[in-house]
Curated annotation (Swiss-Prot):
PROSITE patterns: CYTB_CTER, CYTB_NTER. This is Cytochrome b. InterPro entries: Cyt_b/b6_C (IPR005798), Cyt_b/b6_C_sf (IPR036150), Cyt_b/b6_N (IPR005797), Cytb/b6-like_sf (IPR027387), Cytochrome_b (IPR030689), Cytochrome_b_C_euk/bac (IPR048260), Cytochrome_b_N_euk/bac (IPR048259), Di-haem_cyt_TM (IPR016174). The keyword Metal-binding applies. It is a multi-pass membrane protein. A ubiquinone binds at H201.
Length: 379
C-alpha cells in the first residue's frame, strides 16, 4: 500500500511542495523570507478578517469603529496593532526577499520574478488602501494626494480620478470601495503566491553559488521546515515586542486625529515602507514626470534579467557588484529618510541626487561593473 501523502490527489500536491520537495543543500537564511512572507500573509488575512467583523466603512463611523475595536472588543487592541505592525513586517521581509533575488541572481527565473514584481505591486496597493480605512487625517490626505496623481495621465486623467473617488473628492464612496478592494486583494495575492510557487517549483530553487544543484538535493522536510520554524520564531518575537512595547512606533500621530477635509496636516507622508518611492515622486518638479518615476522605481525590477551582463549568476564571487549593491541599499535608506522630511533645502537636493543615483546604479553602473568583472576574469 502506497503512502497516503504520495497517493492522495490533494495531499500529494502539498507533499510535492513542502515535504518531499528536492531542495539545494546549501541555501542560506536569505531563503527563509519566502516562507516568512507566507506566514505574514496568513496573519494579515486572519487579523484583517476579525477587524472587518467590527469595522464600518462609513465616513461618519469609520474612525469611531476603530476606536471601538481598540477599547471595547476583546483583545481588539492586539488584533489592530498586530494587523498594522504585521504590514510593516511584511514589507521588511518583502524588501529582503527582493534584495536576495537581486544579490543571488534569482531574477533569471523570469516567470517567477515577474509574477513576484506584480505581487509586490498588489501588496503595495493593498497596504495603501488599508492605510485609508481608519479615516484619520493622514488616511484622508494620503488618499487625496496619491489618487490625485492619476490626474497627471494625459486626456483621461481628471475623469479617471473622479471615477476612482466616486465623486468630486475623497468621500464616503471612496472609503467604501477602498474597503471592498482591501478585503478582496489579499485573496487575489494568495492565488498569485500559488502561481509564484508553481513557477518556482518548475525550475527548482536557486542557491548561493548560482550553480546547478541537481546533483546535491535534500528533502525540504525536516531540514528546511525546522529552519523555517526558527525564522518564524524570530519573526514572532520581533513582532510581539513591537506590538506590546511600542505599537505606534512606525505609525503617524496625525492618524489619531479624525479626518478633516478643511484642515491639511503640515507634512503629508505615507507609511515608512513607501517613503523611498514617495521621495522619488517628490524629487521631480513635474507632476507626470514624478508619477512615471514613481511607477518606474518599482517596475525597474522587471528589467533586471535584461540588465544581467555577468557570466556568473550570483554576486557571491563578484566583490565589485557586491559593493555596488550595498551602495544601492544605502541609497534606498537615504531615500526613505528624505521621504519623511519636509520639502525644503537641503532635503530637496539630497532627494534629487539620491533619485538620480538610484536609477543610475541600476541602469548604468551595475551592468557596466558586470562587464568589467567579465573582462578582469578574461571571460
Amino acid at each position: 500500500m502506497t503512502n497516503l501523502r504520495k497517493s492522495h490527489p490533494l495531499i500529494k500536491i502539498i507533499n510535492h511542495s513542502f515535504i518531499d520537495l528536492p531542495t539545494p543543500s546549501n541555501i542560506s537564511t536569505w531563503w527563509n523570507f519566502g516562507s516568512l512572507l507566507g506566514v505574514c500573509l496568513i496573519l494579515q488575512i486572519i487579523t484583517g478578517l476579525f477587524l472587518a467583523m467590527h469595522y464600518t466603512a462609513d465616513t461618519t463611523t469609520a474612525f469611531s469603529s476603530v476606536t471601538h475595536i481598540c477599547r471595547d472588543v476583546n483583545y481588539g487592541w492586539l488584533i489592530r496593532h498586530a494587523h498594522a505592525n504585521g504590514a510593516s513586517m511584511f514589507f521588511i521581509f518583502l524588501y529582503f526577499h527582493i534584495g536576495r533575488g537581486i544579490y543571488y541572481g534569482s531574477y533569471t527565473f523570469m516567470e517567477t520574478w515577474n509574477i513576484g514584481v506584480i505581487l509586490s505591486f498588489a501588496v503595495m496597493a493593498t497596504a495603501f488602501m488599508g492605510y485609508v480605512l481608519p479615516w484619520g487625517q493622514m488616511s484622508f490626505w494620503g488618499a487625496t494626494v496619491i489618487t490625485n496623481l492619476l490626474s497627471a495621465i494625459p486626456y483621461i486623467g481628471p475623469s479617471l480620478v473622479e471615477w476612482i473617488w466616486g465623486g468630486f473628492s475623497v468621500d464616503k464612496a471612496t472609503l467604501t470601495r477602498f474597503f471592498a478592494f482591501h478585503f478582496v486583494l489579499p485573496f487575489i495575492i494568495t492565488a498569485m503566491v500559488m502561481i509564484h510557487l508553481l513557477f518556482l517549483h518548475e525550475t527548482g530553487s536557486n542557491n548561493p553559488s548560482g550553480l546547478n544543484s541537481d546533483s546535491d538535493k535534500i528533502p525540504f522536510h525536516p531540514y528546511y521546515t525546522i529552519k523555517d520554524i526558527l525564522g518564524l520564531l524570530f519573526m514572532l518575537m520581533t513582532l510581539m515586542m513591537l506590538i506590546l512595547f511600542s505599537p505606534d512606533l512606525l505609525g503617524d500621530p496625525d492618524n489619531y486625529t479624525p479626518a478633516n477635509p478643511l484642515n491639511t496636516p503640515p507634512h503629508i507622508k505615507p507609511e515608512w515602507y513607501f517613503l523611498f518611492a514617495y521621495a522619488i515622486l517628490r524629487s521631480i518638479p513635474n507632476k507626470l514626470g514624478g508619477v512615471l518615476a514613481l511607477v518606474f522605481s518599482i517596475l525597474i525590477l522587471m528589467l533586471f534579467p535584461a540588465l544581467h551582463m555577468s557570466k556568473q549568476r550570483t554576486m557571491t564571487f563578484r566583490p565589485l557588484s557586491q559593493c555596488l549593491l550595498w551602495v544601492l541599499v544605502a541609497n534606498l535608506i537615504i531615500l526613505t529618510w528624505i521621504g519623511g522630511q519636509p520639502v525644503e533645502y537641503p532635503f530637496i537636493t539630497i532627494g534629487q541626487l539620491a533619485s538620480i543615483s538610484y536609477f543610475c546604479i541600476i541602469l548604468i553602473l551595475m551592468p557596466t561593473t558586470s562587464l568589467m568583472e567579465n573582462k578582469l576574469l578574461k571571460w
